[in-house]
From Swiss-Prot:
Enzymatic class: transferase
Gene symbol of the encoding locus: pnp
Top-rank lineage group of the source organism: Bacteria
Family: Belongs to the polyribonucleotide nucleotidyltransferase family.
Protein name per the record: Polyribonucleotide nucleotidyltransferase
Provenance organism: Legionella pneumophila (strain Corby)
Length: 729
């Protein structure tokens, strides 16, 4: 096949789609490029074997190569390893809008691999990878009801930005990724700085409109490639069997869905499913048990959906707009820095906040460069939370994705590092789950942080919305259950403060979501969020004014840049000595900002005291409690501040010429001295306050000299009484 290229203007740059040159043995391969960022996306699908599956085995692998930015990977092996969290999140971003577009009962294996080959740091590869995946699917011959387009939308000064650069993103109040077909929005993922529902809805509509040119270009590319798609026909439904299942099980299934307790309801449905399979196999042993089970599931779906559309109570008895009962316990765990047990219906999370110092920040080394993450949020979904057994170990894609959503919801309200210098780690342990566990994590995180004393700008709550739609009839549901998510047409999560939205995630399984439906969903989400915030405020209205007694303390100091060397010392000796003597962790940056970190408040104060003494200047006219550091023939050197001595002349010590200094003072002795003066060379002249002996007679030709430096650093000239030269450390 000859090389085919399509090029369109998309935001600030041209988007180029090429096929026919690279990876020609794949069913579909597209090189998607934009201003130096190039992503190769391939699609391969098995033409048979689907009949043995009872699910759709679609896998999406997004991978970033370090050579794309001219870097060699770190680590011992010097090659790319397991996917990073960012790669996992972008894999999910590609997967979510395309999965609903494959035909029902299409169970053939499909694999999509997106590889970043070249990266311009100003052009994010995620949108390019999503568009490339859509194009590769469209030319692969796989049954796919696409193509889709994708776009990133920013918002600054009242204007929406299409595919903003990384620099523009830093100044934007919105980071929204949207994907969909030319007729419908399918997926939205966003982080915002407390924006209104109208602004968010406008961003979605703007992004959907802007991506239509991309979809048109992909359609043209597919036509030119000209690969025919096999006619895919879903297996014919056995209407006789369907009717028989309806006769045998409908009444019992309807009664089962009146059971409000999830585990009891599931147990009853499992019993009914087995009874139905046994009864029908007894009537006809040629029937397939899996087919009967699938049709039983369709019966469940029909019953639940029609009840809701008919205005009947939901599975747990609520109406469409009511949030489940909420209970909150802060300070749930005794020895943690901050904790919360958040329960909403049958969904529950233990959320724990831990405070650390700058050394605890996570170092992220990706192809975009190294960065430090000062706010980590880890979401864990153990199998016991849904009453099942399963593997426990590394987080799965879903856990990484849910944790990322909850993190984005809190980013807008975190205090500035200068205001609250702690590194924060949140862990959300989902202990029960029946829908919306990620939004329970958002609420629990907000409360746990406030319980830990973190001064959030505002509390954040989240709620998951659902949709049931059949023809022109629809119902928008607030705070959906797991079954309503599974059997419904939309999962729409919204998090925010009283002021506005901070995060939004939407996945739609059907086309035809109108602007009216979206507006109603946002309005109901605001109503639900406001209610939840009210309950949260009753439990903990403001952050704790004091940190937990088990939390470490951090103090930040600022010193002049020319004092940094003094604090560090030769070869780091001074700062190491401070750390060893006080037990305090000390970090100092090039601007002179010092961060002190210790679980011991007294140790922290001692370290501060010693640092202040290190950088303090000796002042004329001040009295100091000094220590005799060295005795010489013409007097004694008195240490006033760390590394800074002054000379107490023999005339201030001895009563007459015959008396020796050693007869009056000993090394290590503490005395109170007065700074009489400092000459141009920085030498300090001292007087002994309240000295015990009478005034000494003047000693002719005795040198009067002093220095800021300790005697250990003086040259042999000191002992001979010669002029002391000033040296720098």
């Amino acid at each position: 096949m000859a090389k085919i290229t399509k090029e369109i203007v998309f935001g600030n740059h041209n988007l180029i789609l090429e096929t026919g040159e690279v990876a020609r043995q794949a069913d579909g391969a597209v090189m998607a490029s934009m201003n130096g960022t190039q992503v190769l996306v391939t699609v391969v699908w098995k033409k048979d074997g689907g009949e043995s599956n009872d699910f759709f085995p679609l896998t999406v692998n997004y991978q970033e190569k370090f050579y794309a930015i001219g870097k060699i990977p770190g680590g011992f092996n010097k090659r790319e390893g397991r996917p990073s969290d960012n790669e996992t999140l972008i894999s999910r971003l590609i997967d979510r809008p395309i999965r609903p577009l494959f035909p029902d009962n299409f169970f053939n294996e499909v694999q999509i691999i997106a590889t970043v080959l070249s990266l311009n740091p100003e052009v994010s590869p995620d949108i390019i990878a999503m568009i490339g995946a859509s194009a590769a699917l469209s030319i692969s011959g796989v049954p796919f009801n696409g193509p889709i387009g994708a776009a990133r939308v920013g918002y600054k000064d009242g204007v929406y930005l299409l595919n903003p650069s990384r620099k523009e993103q830093e100044e934007s109040k919105l980071d929204l990724v949207i994907a969909g077909t030319k007729d419908a929005i399918l997926m939205v993922e966003s982080e915002a700085q407390e924006l209104s529902e109208d602004i968010m809805r406008g961003a979605m509509l703007y992004g959907h409109e802007m991506m239509k040119n991309v979809i048109k270009s992909i359609e043209e590319l597919a036509r030119e490639v000209g690969k025919s798609k096999p006619e895919w026909k879903a297996p014919e439904i056995d209407t006789v069997l369907k009717a028989r299942i309806n006769d045998v099980a409908r009444n019992e299934v309807e009664a089962a869905y009146l059971i409000k307790d999830k585990q009891q309801r599931y147990q009853r449905l499992d019993e009914l499913r087995e009874q139905t399979i046994s009864a029908l196999l007894a009537e006809n042993d040629e029937l397939n048990a899996d087919v009967i089970a699938n049709m039983f599931g369709e019966l469940e779906r029909s019953i639940v959906r029609n009840r809701i559309l008919d205005g009947e109570p939901r599975i747990d008895g609520r109406d469409h707009r009511t949030v489940r009962p909420i209970s909150i316990r802060t300070k749930f765990l005794e020895r943690t820095h901050g904790s919360c047990l958040f329960t909403r219906g049958e969904t529950q999370a233990i959320v724990v906040a831990t405070l650390g110092n700058e050394r605890d920040a996570q170092i992220l080394d990706g192809i975009s460069g190294e960065s430090r993450d000062r706010f980590m949020l880890h979401y864990n979904f153990p199998p016991y939370s849904v009453g099942e057994t399963g593997q426990v170990g590394s987080p799965k894609r879903r856990e990484i994705g849910h944790g990322r959503l909850a993190k984005r919801a809190l980013m807008a309200v975190l205090p500035d590092a200068n205001e609250f210098p702690y590194v924060l780690r949140i862990v959300s342990e989902i202990t029960e789950s029946n829908g919306s566990s990620s939004m329970a994590t958002v609420c629990g995180t907000s409360l746990a942080l406030m319980d830990a004393g973190v001064p959030l700008k505002a509390p954040v709550a989240g709620v998951a919305m659902g949709l049931i739609k059949e023809g022109d009839r629809y119902a928008v549901l607030t705070d959906i259950l797991g079954d309503e998510d599974h059997l419904g047409d939309m999962d729409f999560k919204v998090a925010g403060t009283e002021k506005g939205i901070t995060a939004l995630q939407m996945d739609i399984k059907i086309s035809g979501i109108t602007n009216e439906i979206m507006e109603q969903a946002l309005e109901q989400a605001l109503e639900g969020r406001t209610h939840i915030l009210g309950v949260m405020n009753n439990a903990l209205a403001e952050h704790r004014t004091e940190l937990s007694q088990h939390a470490p303390r951090i103090t930040t100091m600022k010193v002049a840049e020319d004092k940094i060397r003094t604090i560090i010392g030769k070869g780091g000796a001074t700062i190491k000595g401070l750390i060893e003597s006080t037990g305090v962790s000390i970090d100092i940056d090039d601007s002179g900002v010092i961060q002190l970190f210790s679980p011991d408040k007294m140790a922290l104060e001692e370290a501060q005291k010693q640092i202040k003494a290190l950088i303090a200047e000796i002042e004329v006219g001040q009295t100091y409690q000094g220590k005799v550091s060295k005795i010489v023939d013409f007097g004694a050197f008195i240490n006033l501040l760390p590394g800074k001595d002054g000379l107490l002349h023999i005339s201030q010590i001895c009563a007459d010429r015959t008396q020796k200094v050693e007869e009056v003072l000993q090394e290590g002795q503490e005395i109170e001295v007065f700074v009489a003066g400092i000459d141009k060379q920085g030498r300090v002249k001292l007087e002994w306050k309240d000295k015990p002996q009478a005034e000494a007679k003047e000693v002719e030709d005795a040198p009067v000299s002093a220095t800021f430096l300790t005697m250990e650093e003086q040259s042999e000239e000191i002992n001979s009484g010669n002029k002391i030269s000033e040296e720098e450390e």
